[in-house]
Amino acid sequence: VVYTDCTESGEDLCLCEGSNVCGEGNKCILGSDGEKNECVTGEGTPKPQSHNDGDFEEIPEEYLQ
């Protein structure tokens, strides 16, 4: 499973592809046209795993510890 969404709690924690965890003050942006997801400066916001609105997966507990 590839997690591409940020936490919704404002913790600015985000998992990009390849288990790349964005730290505080960064957010994950979804790559397009085959580009990889990357961490950029900005407040973390939920990012969908698919193109369906409201289709989010929880961040695994082990990443939040």
Swiss-Prot record:
Family: Belongs to the protease inhibitor I14 (hirudin) family.
Physiological role: Hirudin is a potent thrombin-specific protease inhibitor. It forms a stable non-covalent complex with alpha-thrombin, thereby abolishing its ability to cleave fibrinogen.
Example of a GO cellular component annotation carried by this entry: extracellular region
Keyword set includes Cytoplasm: no
Short name of any one Pfam family annotated for the protein: Hirudin
Modified residues (Sulfotyrosine): 63
Region (Disordered), start-end ranges: 32-65
Domain of life: Eukaryota
Species whose genome carries this gene: Hirudo medicinalis
Residues annotated as signal peptide: none
Region (Interaction with thrombin active site) residue spans: 1-3
Stretches for region Interaction with fibrinogen-binding exosite of thrombin: 55-65
Sugar-bearing residue positions: 45
Acidic residues bias locations: 55-65
Subcellular location: Secreted
Name assigned to this protein: Hirudin-3A'
InterPro entries linked: Hirudin, Hirudin/antistatin, Prot_inh_hirudin
Keywords, in A-Z order: Disulfide bond, Glycoprotein, Protease inhibitor, Secreted, Serine protease inhibitor, Sulfation
Disulfide-linked positions: 6-14, 16-28, 22-39
GO MF term list: serine-type endopeptidase inhibitor activity
